[in-house]
């Protein structure tokens, strides 16, 4: 069965939660701010959401899942992986079954936002490769495909056992 969900930030107020419920939504994907993913904060959010019959079905935090220190194997990588593992452990303690992961050292790269050829009148992120190719390298050099895969394997070797122990699945975005 398909479960329709909406994304929200961990700082969403009651009016937003009520709005989701009025739309008939039951399931929420929560993006946690850095200071909102300790056990007590997550539990409080779950209790507040339960008042609106809403349930967190998956969670992420940009600071731990879009982390160039991890993705590029930079100094401090192991400490950042430990943070991801703490996040995963808390989600498991709170019975949140899925943690998000995006392997994008530079995030989603866009040139600008505007109405484009295929956006049907809506504003969208536009990629202009000519403009992007003129940019300075974001991390000082080009990383090889092999380096990126090696860093991904390094990450998985250190996080999947924690996910399994916590009862949490990792969803790659």
Model-found features: residue ranges?
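Active-site acidic/histidine proton-transfer and metal-coordination neighborhood
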Residues: 71-172
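N-terminal small/glycine-rich loop or linker at the start of catalytic domains
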Residues: 1-2, 55-71, 131-140
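N-terminal substrate-binding region of glycoside hydrolase catalytic domains
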Residues: 22-40, 60-75
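Acidic-and-aromatic substrate-binding clefts and catalytic sites of carbohydrate-active enzymes
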Residues: 6-15, 31-44, 106-109
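Hydrophobic faces of well-ordered beta-strands that scaffold small-molecule active sites
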Residues: 2-7, 26-30, 56-61, 99-101, ...
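Short, acidic/polar
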Residues: 9-22, 41-45, 79-89
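Mobile, glycine- and charge-enriched loop segments
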Residues: 1-10, 45-51, 68-69
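Conserved, mostly hydrophobic/aromatic
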Residues: 20, 28, 49, 91, ...
């Amino acid at each position: 069965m398909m479960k329709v969900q909406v994304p929200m930030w961990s700082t969403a107020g009651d009016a937003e939660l009520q709005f989701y419920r009025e739309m008939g939504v039951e399931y929420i994907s929560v993006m946690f701010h850095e200071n909102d993913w300790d056990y007590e904060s997550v539990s409080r959010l779950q209790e507040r959401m339960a008042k609106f019959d809403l349930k967190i079905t998956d969670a992420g935090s940009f600071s731990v899942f879009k982390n160039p220190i991890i993705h590029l194997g930079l100094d401090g990588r192991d400490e950042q992986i430990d943070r991801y593992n703490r996040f995963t452990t808390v989600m498991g303690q709170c019975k949140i079954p899925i943690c998000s992961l995006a392997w994008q050292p530079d995030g989603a790269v866009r040139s600008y936002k505007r109405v484009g050829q295929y956006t049907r009148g809506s504003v969208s992120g536009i990629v202009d490769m000519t403009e992007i190719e003129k940019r300075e390298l974001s991390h000082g050099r080009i990383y090889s495909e092999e380096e990126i895969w090696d860093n991904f394997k390094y990450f998985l070797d250190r996080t999947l056992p924690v996910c399994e122990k916590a009862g949490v699945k990792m969803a790659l975005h």
